[in-house]
Amino acid sequence: MQINISTRHGDISDATKEKITQKVEKVQRFFERLTSIDVTVDLGKADEPKIEVHVRPEKRDDFVASYQSGDMFGSLDQVLSKLEQQIKKHKEKLQERGKNVSEDV
């Protein structure tokens, strides 16, 4: 799985990129078949950076979440929480489809 981190309107340190990478890698716990994760840090408002994450799984549309607050890592935690909810909901739908198919047979 590939993780891409980009910034708009400024730069972030390598240490910050490493922390973001470590946090984002945890998304794989929820869904194994991921091709890439794109993280965009928008520093347009210096006091409120915006974090946007696109998760690209195999054979499905992207999961996307964003959040803006005064704390960059707090925003990242909120985004990851939103993504976790989206992925769990998707997995539940897949499981329900499987049950319905087996009941019809």
Ranges and model annotations:
Residues 1-105:
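N-terminal, polar/charged subdomain of small-to-medium soluble alpha/beta proteins
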